[in-house]
């Protein structure tokens, strides 16, 4: 199953890059979840993570608390 996770960042660019590196390291340890890439669709503060997972439950189980710098999010599940 493929998942597109959109987010609108509300912090500094440095904080965004640090958060993304932490997330990549965390997801690399989760069996059954693969990050295919992080894309900037419109402006630098928007991101779209393309991920593959065995189960949507794995994403929710490991995602942890949301940082205050993420303003809006959307998730699209592609089966």
Q: Language-model segments: what does each one mean?
A:
Residues 1-64, 68-79:
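Short S/T/G/P-rich N-terminal loop/turn motif that feeds into the first structured element of a domain
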């Amino acid at each position: 199953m493929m998942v597109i996770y959109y987010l609108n960042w509300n912090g500094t660019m440095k904080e965004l890059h640090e958060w993304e590196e932490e997330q990549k390291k965390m997801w690399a340890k989760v069996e059954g979840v693969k990050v295919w890439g992080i894309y900037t669709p419109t402006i630098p503060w928007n991101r779209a993570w393309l991920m593959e997972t065995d189960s949507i439950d794995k994403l929710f189980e490991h995602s942890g608390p949301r940082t205050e710098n993420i303003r809006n999010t959307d998730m699209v599940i592609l089966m």
